[in-house]
């Protein structure tokens, strides 16, 4: 099990996962929101699941802090081909603990001019992360399938609708 990241915490991939790390995946997962319905005249009420739209992105920066490229649901691959987005999931749900969106990074193919990768998560539906069940993002060693780091958006995201991880 990897590091459970706290808000504002940074890690070095080389230090945490070792030099053998060649491919990583940023996974984003979340559940559908439970909404209570009142019914008609107090009858027929109950709960239903409501879709929630989260989105993962990756920003590539050079040593000077200049934005070099972006990968997100409208640009599924970096120009160099080293980073690929799985596509947009507009509803959430699915198997508990599974990734709804994935960004795969082939570290060996990332250009030397790229010094920093920043992952962002935002809520397109406007829900705060605290109101989205089981929301998380994680960094996975693609070879072993083990988490390198994990961030619990439902707990750490509080009232925010966007985070940079």
Task: Name each model feature, range by range.
Residues 1-165:
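Intrinsic-disorder/low-complexity signal
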